[in-house]
Amino acid sequence: DLVRSRGLGDVYKRQAMFIQSGVADCESLQNIYGPKVEASKTDSAFLKKALNILKLMKCNESEVYFKASEYMYQIDPTADAAVGVAYMYYKKGDYDNAVKYFDEALAKETDNDKKAEMAYATAAALMQAKKLSQARSYCQKAMSFKENYGEPYILLAQLYGSNPNWTDEPALNKCTYFVVIDKLQRAKAV
């Protein structure tokens, strides 16, 4: 067992050196971890490690990241696993399921900065689904979790700007752009 564990230690050291070398990119990590994730889809320790590496390398839009998140969610439906599954659905254009998993992650998460990012991602999914009032609500949630968070203000500006003719009164419709400018100025200020 000691020989076997040392062998694994060497494997992990080599992987760490490869990742830190700067040679590793999302495509190579997809090729390396894709088969390993499939082979280890019930091994939560391996899946956590793979997810951490993929996040560290900013490969959280790769198929292997989505698969690992999906398998991890089946074993242990944590907030992080739910977020991975939510992003998978978001990328596929299934915004209703994306919102469902983002909501679940929001309910489980305790860190307000992460909650802010999840609420913002939910707002973006709702905007894509053309559910503008709900998207606005999630932008406000994101801002309540993290005061100096500019992205929700930018998304709010996009929401308001995407529907400038919300009334039959032309004068009021022109005011929409003042709201857009206000939100962009707030985003710049934070």
Where are the model-predicted features located?
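Single conserved hydrophobic/aromatic residue that forms the stacking wall/gate
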Residues: 1-12
